[in-house]
């Protein structure tokens, strides 16, 4: 039986990793062993970053809603409680967008929330 040398598969595997390592500096781009470690670490950072992005945006929306609510005389928690009691089903992303791009609309929402809290 002939010996299997796996040269083609190895070349393909190396090429794939080295192409993923494009843009890296020095050995991280040129040397397969180092490039493989760099690519794996980069993929870990990318995975973690995708999770962190969701957290960061949610906290940004909360900050924006809180700022707009305080302009209208409510704290964030009281505003959200009032919105919930009104039965308004806007999520934080939508509320933050309204707060930034339509202050008059947000003021109307804040007034509704205030009226529900007073009742």
Curated annotation (Swiss-Prot):
<keyword id="KW-0687">Ribonucleoprotein</keyword>
<dbReference type="GO" id="GO:0019843">
    <property type="term" value="F:rRNA binding"/>
</dbReference>
<dbReference type="GO" id="GO:0005840">
    <property type="term" value="C:ribosome"/>
</dbReference>
<dbReference type="Pfam" id="PF00453">
    <property type="entry name" value="Ribosomal_L20"/>
</dbReference>
<dbReference type="InterPro" id="IPR005813">
    <property type="entry name" value="Ribosomal_bL20"/>
</dbReference>
<keyword id="KW-0689">Ribosomal protein</keyword>
<comment type="similarity">
    <text>Belongs to the bacterial ribosomal protein bL20 family.</text>
</comment>
<dbReference type="InterPro" id="IPR049946">
    <property type="entry name" value="RIBOSOMAL_L20_CS"/>
</dbReference>
<protein>
    <recommendedName>
        <fullName>Large ribosomal subunit protein bL20</fullName>
    </recommendedName>
</protein>
<dbReference type="GO" id="GO:0003735">
    <property type="term" value="F:structural constituent of ribosome"/>
</dbReference>
<keyword id="KW-0694">RNA-binding</keyword>
<comment type="function">
    <text>Binds directly to 23S ribosomal RNA and is necessary for the in vitro assembly process of the 50S ribosomal subunit. It is not involved in the protein synthesizing functions of that subunit.</text>
</comment>
<dbReference type="InterPro" id="IPR035566">
    <property type="entry name" value="Ribosomal_protein_bL20_C"/>
</dbReference>
<dbReference type="GO" id="GO:0006412">
    <property type="term" value="P:translation"/>
</dbReference>
<dbReference type="GO" id="GO:0000027">
    <property type="term" value="P:ribosomal large subunit assembly"/>
</dbReference>
<keyword id="KW-0699">rRNA-binding</keyword>
<dbReference type="GO" id="GO:1990904">
    <property type="term" value="C:ribonucleoprotein complex"/>
</dbReference>
């Amino acid at each position: 039986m002939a010996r299997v040398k796996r040269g083609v598969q190895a070349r393909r595997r190396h090429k794939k990793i080295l192409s993923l390592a494009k843009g890296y500096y020095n050995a991280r781009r040129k040397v397969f062993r180092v490039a493989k470690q760099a690519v794996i670490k980069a993929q870990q950072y990318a995975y973690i970053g995708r999770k962190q992005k969701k957290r960061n945006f949610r906290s940004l929306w909360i900050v924006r809603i809180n700022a707009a609510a305080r302009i209208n005389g409510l704290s964030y928690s009281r505003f959200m409680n009032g919105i919930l009691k009104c039965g308004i089903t806007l999520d934080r992303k939508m509320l933050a967008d309204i707060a930034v791009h339509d202050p008059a609309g947000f003021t109307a929402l804040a007034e509704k929330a205030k009226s529900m809290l007073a009742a």
